[in-house]
Regions:
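Short loop-to-alpha-helix "cap/lid" segments that border enzyme active sites
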Residues: 3-142
Length: 142
């Protein structure tokens, strides 16, 4: 991966908890030497807690729709070091997000479906307090 790009791994376990998922994923990532290129995210605060307990240096983010819900989970003690809201659900003023890493996502199309065709206005997102974005089509921004 390029130095300024990270790969987000979303742990899809907020409805059904998969025993040992976090351990297996960390083992796989470390076996390939990719630990510095990965961000782990989940809607499950417990899953983020487990990742952080297993690897205190792991980059993690708590997912939710609204940024206020992400912040609520973070302050609940999940140990995430970033907020991962939907980019269209920035319901707090940017000054409330000062000091936080805010990696926003969208529900855009996934490869190999037809490309979305547009580009996000990254400057406008930054003005809302977003520091990073998850993209299904990162090649459009290179």
């Amino acid at each position: 991966l390029k130095d300024d790009f990270k790969l987000n791994i979303e742990l899809k376990n907020s409805v059904v908890p998969y025993e040992g998922m976090e351990e297996k994923i960390l083992e796989l990532i470390y076996s390939r030497g990719l630990q510095n290129s990965i961000v782990y995210s989940s809607f499950s605060a417990l899953s983020i807690e487990r990742i952080r307990a297993l690897d205190k240096d792991a980059a993690t983010g708590i997912l939710d729709g609204r940024v206020s819900d992400c912040l609520y989970k973070l302050k609940g003690g999940c140990g995430a070091n970033a907020l991962h809201p939907n980019w269209g659900e920035m319901d707090l003023p940017p000054e409330k997000l000062t000091g936080y890493t805010v990696r926003a996502w969208s529900g855009g199309r996934m490869f190999p479906e037809k490309p979305a065709g547009g580009r996000l206005d990254l400057a406008a997102l930054e003005r809302k307090g977003i520091t990073d974005v998850f993209l299904n089509e990162p090649e459009r921004y290179l």
